From Swiss-Prot:
It is a multi-pass membrane protein. The chain crosses the membrane at residues 168-188, 225-245, 264-284. It comes from Pongo abelii (Sumatran orangutan). Found in a complex with TMEM177, COA6, MT-CO2/COX2, COX20, SCO1 and SCO2. Interacts transiently with MT-CO2/COX2 during its maturation. Interacts with COX20 in a MT-CO2/COX2-dependent manner. The keyword Mitochondrion applies. This is Cytochrome c oxidase assembly protein COX18, mitochondrial. Pfam families: 60KD_IMP (PF02096).
Length: 334
């Protein structure tokens, strides 16, 4: 039985063509009423932080200044109050930057998923060849196992190169989205505390103090009702659960990561209750847009529009499936 791999053939022993271009197998080595008090880190002017502190360096960095100018520019161009311009800026940035990257992430992961049957076939043939060679050369089980793992990693890497879908490429979204989230958060912190690197810094702080709506009318103060922080935690947990509901048979590492993200989602609630409402409003809008993008990228029509390859795990009714799984896990269970 032959298994084609990028122009190379895997043949049963004794041919061992698997290593035709490599050395032979060998064993491998091992206001008014008292305003809620902000924490020191949220209100201390940048100049008051230790001269060599990382916090000062980050708050005064060029990316944070750019984020400040983006927020000020959107606010000036639209004429919206701050409670409207912050969500608009968030949606625009997430739509222009993270949505394409999220689509690319799904594209890579779909190609990796479609490689799994071929990888399983290669693993079976390789395991047979290593077993025969180990018997011929008298390798120990440990040496045979290490040799199998080394060559399996090499062959999988060749598949990723062939199809241009190395899984690390799927992490580019995190490396862009997380810094952007941090820079925008620091920019809003600077604007809300008068520490903005702009001549209009203090006037912006005054605008933010009167630029809220409903129960969070002062965007420079924490939300005294905790409605924004709790809403943030709920949306973040909802994102986590939707992702988990779509997975079957998670590994132990994936399970640990899921518990960690759940814990961080809950921990963000008391943290969000101590920072200016402008920051929490940004966090809430960012999470809501993230949830919307997550659902959008499950749409068969949108996936086809983005040229994301079809996979065995795709569903024609993804939203109905999510609702059914959610109902089974959290509502209908006894």
């Amino acid at each position: 039985m032959l298994c084609r791999l990028g122009g190379r053939w895997l043949r049963p022993l004794p041919a061992l063509q698997l290593w035709a271009r490599d050395p032979p197998l060998a064993p491998v080595p091992t206001s008014g009423a008292k305003r809620p008090t902000l924490p020191v880190w949220a209100v201390t002017p940048v100049s008051a932080v230790h001269a060599n502190g990382w916090y000062e360096a980050l708050a005064a960095s060029s990316p944070v200044r750019v984020a400040e100018e983006v927020l000020l520019g959107v606010h000036a161009a639209t004429g919206l109050p701050w409670w409207g311009s912050i969500p608009l800026s968030t949606a625009a940035l997430r739509g222009a930057v993270t949505l394409p990257l999220a689509a690319y992430q799904h594209y890579i992961l779909a190609k990796v998923e479609n490689l799994q049957p071929e990888i399983k076939t290669i693993a079976r043939h390789l395991n047979q060849e290593v077993a025969v060679r180990a018997n011929q050369l008298g390798w120990s089980k440990r040496d045979a196992r290490l040799t199998y793992l080394k060559n399996m990693r090499r062959l999988i890497s060749e598949l990723y190169v062939r199809d241009n879908c190395h899984p690390f490429k799927a992490t580019v979204l995190v490396w862009i989205q997380l810094p952007m989230w941090i820079f925008m958060s620091f920019a809003l912190r600077n604007l809300s505390t008068g520490a903005a690197h702009s001549e209009a810094g203090f006037s912006v702080e005054e605008q933010l103090a009167a630029g809220g709506i409903l129960w969070f009318s002062d965007l420079t103060a924490p939300d005294p009702t905790w409605i924004l922080p709790v809403s943030l935690g709920v949306i973040n947990l909802l994102i986590v659960e939707i992702c988990v509901l779509q997975k079957i048979g998670m590994s132990r590492f994936q399970t640990y990561i899921t518990y960690f993200v759940r814990a961080m989602s809950v921990l963000m609630i008391p943290i969000a209750a101590t920072v200016p409402s402008s920051i929490v409003l940004y966090w809430l809008c960012s999470s809501f847009v993230g949830l919307s993008q997550n659902l959008l990228l499950r749409s068969p029509g949108f996936r086809q529009l983005c040229r994301i390859p079809s996979t065995k795990s795709d569903s024609e009714t993804p939203y109905k499936d999510i609702f059914a799984a959610f109902n089974t896990k959290f509502i209908s269970r006894k």
